[in-house]
Amino acid sequence: MTIRSLPAALSPLSMAVQAVLLVSSLALAPAANAKPVTWEDIANDHLNTQNVLQYGMGTNAQRWSPLAMVNDKNVFKLTPAWSYSFGDERQRGQESQAIINDGVIYVTGSYSRVFALDAKTGRRLWTYNHRLPDNIRPCCDVVNRGAAIFGDKIYFGTLDARVIALNKDTGKVVWNKKFGDHSAGYTMTGAPTLIKDQKSGKVLLIHGSSGDEFGVVGQLYARDPETGEEVWMRPFVEGHMGRLNGKDSTPTGDVKAPSWPDDPTTETGKVESWSHGGGAPWQSASFDPETNTIIVGAGNPGPWNTWARTSKDGNPHDFDSLYTSGQVGVDPTTGEVKWFYQHTPNDAWDFSGNNELVLFDYKDKDGKQYKATAHADRNGFFYVVDRTNGKLKNAFPFVDNITWASHIDLKTGRPVENEGQRPAKPLPGETKGKPVEVSPPFLGGKNWNPMAYSQDTGLFYVPANHWKEEYWTEEVNYKKGSAYLGIGFRIKRMYEDHVGSLRAMDPTTGKVVWEHNERLPLWAGVLATKGNLVFTGTGDGYFKAFNAKTGEELWKFQTGSGIVSPPITWEQDGEQYIGVTVGYGGAVPLWGGDMAELTKPVAQGGSFWVFKIPAWDTKTAKR
């Protein structure tokens, strides 16, 4: 089957479905009355074992817990404590990382829903169901990846391009801000991030936008968490104008945008693609208080077709399509770009740059230490970047058989591309270019699903995939609300025995320390703990625990539907709990070609599972 446009499942939602998407706040129990969250709580989230307040389990996004009550010696005793069903017919992909504060879990669901649950029992405290219009345009399923919390409010984004604040105890709407035209493709699927500007002392709510596949211009926002009012907005296409306090501020990069071709026949003086250039920061940001820097990934350029972003008869290597498919350091006071590192210049394959940016202390082969970001890109390369200035320190492949580039030049920071891997223009008189086989495909060596870093082993645990793809160019013109790709594609198998591969990577040597292969693609995030454990989920519904040092599979549990979310862990009343959202969906079954066929037998679902060692047997057991 040739895929040339967005899946039918992502057309405007039917009136029948929308009829049941009612705004509600069901007070099925007394108000949660959890403690208000302070900035100090958020700043110490990575150290606090009782709460999980940020996406990434801390502003450093390491997904590392110092808890060890559940460990490699007793993890085989894990049993379900409870499970909560999201209910009704609204299933699809459940990609949410839950957060927890003072014994209350807040987890988002598909179709822009939020649930507040008692962390001990799973009892529902309240539910918020957002009313969605018919003409939303999510590219990659009706997912939501999580909420944020500060003070007495819960914050999350919606598929109709809104960011909403709810009272954390009742689920009532406090404020609701529209930031983009959803009919043009603007959405919000990522979890917002709370940061504190070290210069002004103000706490800010940071969120991005989605919609690169529809020709939006990606934008990063800072808001007052109390009122929702915009403080600043920064676009991620070179030459587009930012805002500060409601007024135009500065353009992003050079106002003349030399990384995008000129076209004197247009109103802007630039090629059409510049006006619809993508770069959407749809994943959650990280924050480095030491350098007072927001660090976030920028999405793919629009359209995918590299020739639409290259001058007539020009060379794609002369036009990098800034500031797309890379990582950006942003000043929280003004929204200005402090630094930018591009993983894939003039990205021709939709590799994007949105995968998480993990903050860690990197020690190079000579023993010199740097404050760094770690990033496993969809293009198949793992990057270590100095987060004080955006300079590349190390890069190496984390998946097999990368075809589009031979390596990353550590001196220039640029990929060394292999000839013939950019899909060629159609020949004269033809509407489609000659197909070219590329690996990884646009779904990536790893996609949005976040890796974890262990402070004990010094390893990154990367949920990777091995697959490949045929690409070919097609004619492309912008039309509001329609897919803006200019590329056709089909994803294919690389190996017969597996697609997914959980890999433990050494960031200094680039070596694979261990790997565990899975038959289906890996689309779940990873959690690492001081108990020498690594947790993740599989496409066929298993929640698994591995020995962090050796990769030995120690425990698994069948949840009933595929897992495409990041797990969390916390301590309550002297016991360690592990929780994970369950429900198969996301991009793979919608865009995945042969992979969609492979995953057809997986049942949909929507639930949150919690595990612990039974109270009657909490002593460390000998195996």
UniProtKB/Swiss-Prot annotation:
pH dependence: Optimum pH is 9.0.
Keywords: Calcium, Disulfide bond, Metal-binding, Oxidoreductase, Periplasm, PQQ, Repeat, Signal, WD repeat
Phenotype upon loss of function: Cells lacking this gene show a strong reduction in the growth rate on ethanol, however growth on 1-butanol or 1,2-propanediol is not influenced.
Enzymatic reactions: a primary alcohol + 2 Fe(III)-[cytochrome c] = an aldehyde + 2 Fe(II)-[cytochrome c] + 2 H(+); ethanol + 2 Fe(III)-[cytochrome c] = acetaldehyde + 2 Fe(II)-[cytochrome c] + 2 H(+); ethanol + A = acetaldehyde + AH2; 1-propanol + 2 Fe(III)-[cytochrome c] = propanal + 2 Fe(II)-[cytochrome c] + 2 H(+)
Record-linked InterPro entries: ADHI, PQQ_b-propeller_rpt, PQQ_MeOH/EtOH_DH, PQQ_rpt_dom, Quinoprotein_ADH-like_sf, Quinoprotein_DH_CS
Induction pattern: Induced by ethanol, and to a lesser extent, by 1-propanol and other alcohols. Repressed by lactate, acetate and tricarboxylic acid cycle intermediates such as citrate and succinate. Up-regulated by exaE and agmR.
Protein's pathway: Alcohol metabolism; ethanol degradation; acetate from ethanol: step 1/2
Subunit structure: Homodimer.
Family affiliation: Belongs to the bacterial PQQ dehydrogenase family.
Full protein name: Quinoprotein ethanol dehydrogenase
Species of origin: Pseudomonas putida (Arthrobacter siderocapsulatus)
